[in-house]
């Protein structure tokens, strides 16, 4: 049921994908409040139907409480590993799985459009911008709990991965869009650290550079070309990835 942006790397650019996938994600989703499922989405069996009466003030408070830095328990039917085995595999084999809460950041959680009231449940269209590793299904589930009911996800579309939006993508079966260069890709998702030819050569030889930059991950450009991705800690570099060649 999920659609939207999927960033694919070709050749040596595949080594950069982890920096892209670690970027915040933006989604458009539909949440059905008043009904819960085994998987927290529409693909699972309905497990409860307590219903929910439209309450805009209560909804606003619940959404606000789930925005910012929160602790989230991933959906049990997920790819999270428990003692080396995916949680969804344990659930499907009949095990009861309890996953630990993990910190995530919800930068944006907004209800868009008008609610659709159908019987004893309400469908809400929402926009979510969240840190990598966030389960929007779990966010829907937790919204239901905060509203004193249950909820699950009925539609999900990823509209952006970091700065890469759905408008830059091609649908499967269509002519693909122009390939984005590795330099352009990493420069859009990471801050740039420009160094001289001599410093670039030192990095290639495995030397540590002392730089005037804050802690974080940077793409190193030498004469406008990406050479490496480095982590900077206390002004010192550590190579994460080198460009080929």
Predicted feature residues:
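RNA pseudouridine synthases
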Residues: 1-138, 142-167, 229
